Amino acid sequence: MKLTATILSAGLWLGVAAAQQPVVAPKTAPATHVTKDQIQEFFAKLPPGRILDSPIRVVDVGGYKVGVYAVTRPKDSPQDAIYHDTNMTEILYMLEGSANLITGGTIPDGRPPARPGGNFTGTKIDGGTSRHVVPGDVIITPGRTPHLWANIESDMTYLVFRPDPDGTQQLR
């Protein structure tokens, strides 16, 4: 019995050792580095007082694209509910400012996009969930999820990371 257990144990370890193989990186860029200085310089070049959503970098990561965007949203800017008809998730990292972000629910007065590939918009969201967002917070909004900024307390700047399985973003 002891010999059988020893043989089985040795066979198990040999199988594990044989299954281990070197990991080879795919033939894509190993990583993309966007530095703090690059981000700050990018924001500094944006014109003040406007809603802007501008790509800092968009890269192909092997089968899909990922974008890093700089967003500015002045306190007194008009706010629309928005719905992106895409699988692209938005991961928001708030840098400055605070407001409530309403996600989910429905846009009862939704207007179709003004151009192909554009967004559905409206004036409000019914049945959504409101969250107070402050600097340092992260919000993950799946594609095809209505969202709306409300009660903006101060000018906002934030980063949005957009994994794009449909490949709709332009490389930058």
Where are these regions (language model features)?
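Short acidic-glycine-tyrosine-enriched beta hairpin
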Residues: 106-143
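A cytosolic small-molecule/anion-sensing beta-strand core signal
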Residues: 95
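Alpha/beta-hydrolase fold active-site loops
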Residues: 89
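Ligand-binding loop in jelly-roll beta-barrel domains
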Residues: 132-137, 143-167
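Structured binding elements
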Residues: 92
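Short beta-strand segments in beta-sandwich/barrel cores
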Residues: 98-101
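Bacterial N-terminal signal peptides
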Residues: 5-17
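A short, N-terminal "cap"/entry segment at the start of jelly-roll beta-barrel domains
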Residues: 18-86, 171
